[in-house]
Swiss-Prot record:
It holds the Pfam family Profilin. It is found in: Cytoplasm, Cytoskeleton. The modification Phosphothreonine is found at T114. A motif (Involved in PIP2 interaction) lies at residues 84-100. It comes from the Eukaryota. One of its GO terms (cellular component) is cell cortex. Disulfide bonds join C13-C118. The keyword Phosphoprotein applies. Phosphorylated by MAP kinases. This is Profilin-2. Signal peptide: none annotated.
């Protein structure tokens, strides 16, 4: 399966049981910051933003004082799973980033999608990729 199909079919799809509710943007990005696939709405990010995210996976808590920045948007870092998932909140929306062996699975949401729904969509694909050795 092509990487774009993972984004289109598994991240930007309707949320289970909530027809018409979906993430506002999603991407799969390599650990080096190269974009493997993304939705048309995924923000253009700076290399230093991706470096900060990768540092937080290696040194959990790194982003907590400054926030998570992606595409010029600042998210307040909320509970995650050290070395596995980073979650951020901004107003009525937020972001979930799941690290796999080779990539970051990113999902951005706004209401009516809930944080839990975004987590489920992003982490389910991330877990699948981990199971595949990716």
């Amino acid at each position: 399966m092509l990487w774009q199909a993972y984004v289109d079919d598994h991240l930007m799809c309707d949320i289970e049981g909530h027809e018409g509710h979906r993430l506002t943007a999603a991407a799969i990005v390599g650990h080096d910051g190269s974009v493997w696939a993304q939705s048309a709405t995924f923000p253009q990010f700076k290399p230093e933003e991706m470096n900060g995210i990768m540092t937080d996976f290696n040194e959990p808590g790194h982003l907590a004082p400054t926030g998570l920045h992606l595409g010029g948007t600042k998210y307040m870092v909320i509970q995650g799973e050290a070395g596995a998932v980073i979650r951020g909140k901004k107003g009525s929306g937020g972001i979930t980033i799941k690290e796999t062996g080779q990539a970051l699975v990113c999902g951005i949401y706004k209401e009516p999608v809930t944080p839990g729904q975004c987590n489920m969509v992003v982490e389910r694909l991330g877990d699948y990729l981990l199971e595949q050795g990716l």
